[in-house]
């Protein structure tokens, strides 16, 4: 009798483990499929193409609203005993008016003598015409103006055609938020890492980890967000990382 109860308990635990494993595999598959939809946008070399790209639509969109694509790329560098500085650009690609506006942003963060966090943001308004970034206000600094005019978003040169070859990925899912992510250790020979090093002065030889993360319904949501993060260094004294996002939202 005792042996029979133990056998039933053992079978129950085995079935429970199989069920949990199957659910986990299903979630992993859904997460990868969800990310692949976003990653398929890379590369979109001509940003004007977003005027004709349809994104996920739900009840948050008003009737007749074609939506707005929001693209954002940012490089952040914080070295030991130095200010954290980030340089980024965000564009709002309005499919209704077929016009694009945004900002190039230089941000500095530091601690004052009392240990309080301080920050300073400097924004330079821009527009996009025929895949060209154009400052909408005069910029006296020629070097800065050229940096803005020559800026390229990661979506214009990033490529994830080999994403399925990435190994040892750490897939996680939190149904309570809900949020989900996939993390991979990359090498310096990775195509996207080479492209980032080509375009930015990245003061480390360490290969980055790639974190792809999102929140909202796995089946799709205009409320949720997705973004990529290449983290080269992350500790209490230094931080070096690059982030990129492409999101489709109702037009405001």
Swiss-Prot record:
A lipid is attached at residue 23 (N-palmitoyl cysteine). It is found in: Cell membrane. Its main location: membrane. Residues 1-22 form the signal peptide. Disulfide bonds: none annotated. A lipid is attached at residue 23 (S-diacylglycerol cysteine). The keyword Translocase does not apply. Keywords: Cell membrane, Lipoprotein, Membrane, Palmitate, Signal. It is a lipid-anchor. GO terms for cellular component: plasma membrane. Belongs to the staphylococcal tandem lipoprotein family. This is Uncharacterized lipoprotein SAS2375. It comes from Staphylococcus aureus (strain MSSA476).
